[in-house]
Structure formats: structure tokens, C-alpha cells
């Protein structure tokens, strides 16, 4: 869905995210 797509974009672009954030976003 759109929310998941947004999370993928954030995962691709955000270098400051923690490992837990990546796991939550499904990346």
C-alpha cells in the first residue's frame, strides 16, 4: 500500500535510520 511504499523510499534514502527502523519498514 502507499504507506509501505513511503517507508521503502525512506529506507532507500535515509542513512540515519536504525536497524530496527529498517526491520519495521520491511526493507
Swiss-Prot record:
GO cellular component, one term: extracellular region
Necessary cofactors: Ca(2+)
Modification after translation (UniProt): Contains 7 disulfide bonds.
Protein location: Secreted
GO molecular function: metal ion binding; phospholipase A2 activity; potassium channel regulator activity; toxin activity
The protein's Enzyme Commission number: 3.1.1.4
Tissue occurrence: Expressed by the venom gland.
Disulfide bonds: none
Function as written in the Swiss-Prot or TrEMBL entry: Heterotrimer: blocks the voltage-dependent L-type calcium channels from the heart, and the small conductance calcium-activated potassium channels in the chromaffin cells and in the brain. Is very toxic to mice. Monomer: Snake venom phospholipase A2 (PLA2) that has neurotoxic activities. Voltage-dependently affects ionic currents in chick (Gallus domesticus) dorsal root ganglion cells. PLA2 catalyzes the calcium-dependent hydrolysis of the 2-acyl groups in 3-sn-phosphoglycerides.
Protein name, entry field: Phospholipase A2 taicatoxin
Species whose genome carries this gene: Oxyuranus scutellatus scutellatus
Lineage: Eukaryota, Metazoa, Chordata, Craniata, Vertebrata
Amino acid at each position: 500500500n502507499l504507506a509501505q511504499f513511503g517507508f521503502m523510499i525512506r529506507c532507500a534514502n535515509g542513512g540515519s535510520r536504525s536497524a530496527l527502523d529498517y526491520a519495521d519498514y520491511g526493507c
